[in-house]
Curated annotation (Swiss-Prot):
It comes from Nymphaea alba. It is found in: Plastid, Chloroplast. Residues 1-22 are annotated as: Disordered. It comes from the Eukaryota. One of its GO terms (molecular function) is rRNA binding. This is Small ribosomal subunit protein uS11c. PANTHER family: 40S RIBOSOMAL PROTEIN S14/30S RIBOSOMAL PROTEIN S11. SUPFAM superfamilies: Translational machinery components.
Length: 138
């Protein structure tokens, strides 16, 4: 008489596991956000779904060392190693922020063997928007 209720949880779990394992993206987008305190590297597919990510903090750097170029290089290497294993060959790079890790992260990306279509600077620049914070007096 009554229809059986499908188990949503089991279907959802199988869908997530199949997405994680069978993820082959030959082209992707690498987002590098370099602030003065940290560098975050996120690798997405062309639709914007995150495939891999890493930051200087997750690589074991704490405190002021997270903002260093070496920490950014390590974070970029960790994020890209995972997607190269999944078969990514080409990528576009979007760099955002004024941090020290911009060039180091780009150097690590170039050394990884991924062919870069283009490198774009997407740092947000205000057209005289909000008032900046006051200058520090030390």
């Amino acid at each position: 008489m009554t229809k059986p209720i499908p188990k949503i949880g089991s279907r959802r779990n199988s869908r997530i596991s199949s997405r994680k394992s069978g993820c082959r993206t030959p082209i992707g987008v690498i987002h590098v956000q370099a602030s003065f305190n940290n560098t975050i590297v996120t690798v997405t597919d062309p639709q914007g779904r995150v495939v891999s990510w890493s930051s200087a903090g997750t690589c074991g750097f704490k405190g002021t060392r997270r903002g260093t170029p070496f920490a950014a290089q390590t974070a970029a290497g960790n994020a890209i190693r995972a997607v190269v294993d999944q078969g990514m060959q080409r990528a576009e790079v979007m760099i955002k922020g004024p941090g020290l890790g911009r060039d180091a992260a780009l150097r690590a990306i170039r050394r990884s063997g991924i062919l870069l279509n283009f490198v774009r600077d997407v740092t947000p620049m205000p057209h005289n928007g909000c008032r900046p914070p006051k200058k520090r007096r030390v």
